[in-house]
Amino acid sequence: MGSTSDKASGLANEAVGKAKEGVGKAVGNDRLRAEGAAQEAKGKVQKAVGDAKSAVKDATNKTAAAINKNL
């Protein structure tokens, strides 16, 4: 996945996870609450991966630009 895809998937998983967790708490369903918490955590990790990919890409582009400028 690209950084944008990772970020979007991460945000979606966070949102769905929060919703599941909230519904699970509201209806007293511990399994649904736990699934929601796990999905939210997965989303946070996906988003962090996307952020890291973006940072690496930006650093690579800056390095390439600096090298090309000095050639």
From Swiss-Prot:
InterPro entries: CsbD, YjbJ_sf
Residues covered by region (Disordered): 1-42
Pfam families in UniProt: CsbD
Amino acid composition bias (Basic and acidic residues), ranges on this chain: 17-34
Family (UniProt): Belongs to the UPF0337 (CsbD) family.
Name of this chain's protein: UPF0337 protein mlr2098
Native organism: Mesorhizobium japonicum (strain LMG 29417 / CECT 9101 / MAFF 303099) (Mesorhizobium loti (strain MAFF 303099))
